[in-house]
Amino acid sequence: VLEWLRAAGAGLSDDAVLSKTEALAWLNRPMRLVGVVRNEGQPGGGPFWVRIHSGVDAGLVRPQIVESIEFEEDQKALMAQATHFNPVDMVCVLRPGQSLAPFVDVSRYMLATKEVQGEKVKVLEHPGLWNGGMSGWLNRFVEIPSFCFQPVKSALDLIDRR
């Protein structure tokens, strides 16, 4: 159990010892298994280690999905070195009636440019469900074959099918 929790980003050191109560508290969280593909230059984010700023994991460094727009300019080189790309497939496990609110990192945000009635405007967005919304979930990233990924960033991507 400890090995899986370490790999899922539970913030446990190699010599950590958990009581049964602590282990069950970690295992009682919602879980997601995320299939990612090798980064072949497509635009977008990917899996990274992130320091959590709010919620049940404040202060911990956990594996997270980070969108390219969330990176500061001085971090763009780090993003370019990423070995894997955004999630392709996701398997989620949660308990009926389980509140997901404690597992959200509300401190994450993105500044984006959108078009509203023909004019470009800057908007503040909170990351979606698979980003900050699943921050406190137990996350496990696994590599899957690249043929599983069919990106659609624009209508032209629908034509470029190999």
Language model features: what each stretch is:
Residues 1-162:
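OB-fold and OB-like single-stranded nucleic-acid-recognition modules
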